[in-house]
From Swiss-Prot:
Residues 1-7, 73-80, 129-141, 194-237, 285-295, 345-360, 405-425 are cytoplasmic. It comes from Klebsiella pneumoniae. Signal peptide: none annotated. PROSITE patterns: MFS. This is D-arabinitol transporter. The lineage of its organism: Bacteria, Pseudomonadati, Pseudomonadota, Gammaproteobacteria, Enterobacterales.
Length: 425
């Protein structure tokens, strides 16, 4: 299969409109991220109940993320994206009308959970399109751009737009506006990705062989030690991102006196920073080595900036300027894990879809575990207990990285691994 090599700073131009579709769709999906937990609490539910809704959402997202890579290879990335697009729109409407509209907690969990199954099909299937349409030694920067447009959508526009719309049309009006963005993103993807190159060998498999390949997305975790360790590091990667979106609105708004709009703007600055850091770390990963960037900048950087995100606002109180410092730091270092997306398919070059499914599963599990940790620890240790737990896990990830061996294009095996890795005893 021929690959189009035209690019701009690592951005594959043949997939440009696909990247734009991701940004627009995730803008709509991101509207709720930084205020929904607070809004559910305002409907009369406890912080733990609000966090559990996100936990269930994350569990559904993890399941969907797990199958998305293989399904995208079997039925093509575009068809998988369209399934996710339709599911998202249908269950978003049901969530708003029957869940939030009637303050019915059971229906909130049901429809929000099912909707959580939808967005990974749209989002992560595009990674399969990237992997099969760019050279492997450019994969890190191409996926860096993927996470950059993801950040533009879910974080920057997804946070800034609600900060201006909520004072005028309220939370529910803002959530209805999200539907328009997701509809637009889905249509852009449908039109622009019709002619992308996708592998054909999976589409000719028998039904039994297709299920066997789908199962490989799970079996890789115990047949390939490097995949297992990389999965654990990827799960830890975004704990603070998903966890802080749940617990920090309550700290900033209810405890420190920030308005909802101010908090949303702080959160948007975090995501705005990741636009540039995703691209930067993707490129640096190709220059310095994938695992070196992940270990020394991702793990250590996130451990320190997660602590700062709690202690600096606690020390300075209602200071918008000081709150931006840890937000920017968090945005810089969370993106240093970007090279992991290139590590997974490099570890299983003959089963890239299954490897990407494990990567996607790990991202989804992070979405699930981050609020789950908050649900367990918040009643006993308050916000600081959750922050310390996340920090400790980043330190664990630092040590796990030392055992991951991967051949990186452009690096000798010795250069890429020997100095950073230790043999299991």
């Amino acid at each position: 299969m021929s690959i189009n090599n035209k690019q701009w700073l690592g951005l594959p131009l043949n997939l440009l409109w696909g990247y734009i579709a991701i940004a627009v769709f995730m803008t709509g999906d991101g509207f709720e991220l930084a205020f929904l937990s607070h809004y559910i609490k305002a409907l009369g539910f406890s912080p733990a109940e609000a966090s559990f809704a996100f936990t269930l959402y994350g569990l559904a997202a993890a399941l969907s993320a797990w199958i998305s890579g293989v399904v995208a290879e079997i039925i093509t990335p575009l068809k998988t994206m369209m399934i996710g697009f339709v599911l998202w729109c249908v269950f978003h409407v049901l969530f708003l009308v029957f869940g939030l509209g009637h303050a019915n907690y059971a229906l909130i969990l049901l429809f929000y959970g099912i909707r959580g199954f939808a967005y990974p099909l749209f989002l992560y299937s595009f990674i399969v399109a990237i992997v099969h349409n760019v050279k492997s030694d450019n994969a890190s920067s191409a996926i860096g751009w993927f996470w950059a447009v993801y950040s533009i959508g879910i974080g920057v526009f997804g946070s800034y737009i609600p900060s201006f719309t909520i004072p005028h049309i309220g939370e529910m009006g803002t959530l209805w506006l999200a539907l328009a963005f997701c509809l637009t993103g889905g249509v852009i993807a449908l039109v622009s990705l019709r002619h992308i190159q996708t592998p054909q060998h999976m589409q000719n498999l028998t039904t039994r062989e297709k299920f066997s390949e789908l199962g490989r997305a799970a079996t890789l975790l115990y047949t390939n030690r490097n995949i297992l360790l990389s999965s654990m590091v990827r799960i830890i990667n975004t704990l603070s991102l998903f966890g802080f979106a749940v617990i920090m609105p309550m700290m900033f708004v209810d405890e420190l006196g920030f308005s909802t709009s101010e908090w949303l703007q702080v959160w948007a600055v975090f995501f705005f920073t990741t636009i540039f850091s995703n691209v930067l770390w993707g490129i640096l990963g190709e220059k310095l080595g994938w695992m070196k960037v992940v270990r020394w900048f991702g793990c250590i950087g996130m451990a320190l900036s997660s602590l700062a995100f709690y202690y600096i606002p606690q020390h300075f109180g209602h200071s918008f300027a000081m709150a931006l410092i840890p937000a920017i730091a968090l945005g810089i270092f969370v993106a240093a894990f970007v090279p992991l997306a290139a590590v997974f398919p490099a570890l299983e070059p003959k089963h890239k879809g299954a490897a990407i499914s494990v990567y996607n599963l790990s991202a989804g599990m992070s979405n699930f575990l981050a609020p789950a940790i908050a649900v367990v620890l918040l009643p006993f240790f308050s916000t600081i207990g959750v922050v310390i737990a996340y920090t400790a896990l980043y330190v664990v990830a630092f040590f796990l990285c030392a055992f991951i061996r991967v051949e990186q294009p452009g690096f000798s095996h010795k250069e890429a691994t020997a100095r950073e890795q230790v043999e299991f005893s």
